[in-house]
Amino acid sequence: MKLTCVLIVAVLFLTACQLATAENSREEQGYSAVRSSDQIQDSDLKLTKSCTDDFEPCEAGFENCCSKSCFEFEDVYVCGVSIDYYDSR
């Protein structure tokens, strides 16, 4: 009978220790689902090819414009359809 009581107390003690340890490790980790979704969003941003919108500054000779056209306008290179395009219509 004494042995059974000692075993029950030991099992309860070990269970309490495991629960306390699990709670502490969860607080240190944070929410893993939130962390993993943030990591996925960051990796999506790195994988997505970004382009420069129309009328934003661009670098001549590089195809970084969404419209694939970088032209000089008032001493600055900008993305978009050049004014010559509108004049030829």
Curated annotation (Swiss-Prot):
InterPro entries according to UniProt: Conotoxin (IPR004214)
Alphabetized UniProt keyword annotations: Amidation, Disulfide bond, Ion channel impairing toxin, Knottin, Neurotoxin, Secreted, Signal, Toxin
Record's signal peptide: 1-22
Propeptide regions on this chain: 23-49, 80-89
GO molecular function, one term: toxin activity
Superkingdom of source: Eukaryota
Residues modified to Cysteine amide: C79
GO terms under cellular component: extracellular region
Native organism: Conus bullatus (Bubble cone)
Family: Belongs to the conotoxin O1 superfamily.
One Pfam family in the UniProt entry: Conotoxin
Domain description: The presence of a 'disulfide through disulfide knot' structurally defines this protein as a knottin.
Name of this chain's protein: Conotoxin Bu5
Compartment(s): Secreted
Disulfide pairings: C51-C66, C58-C70, C65-C79
Annotated tissue distribution: Expressed by the venom duct.
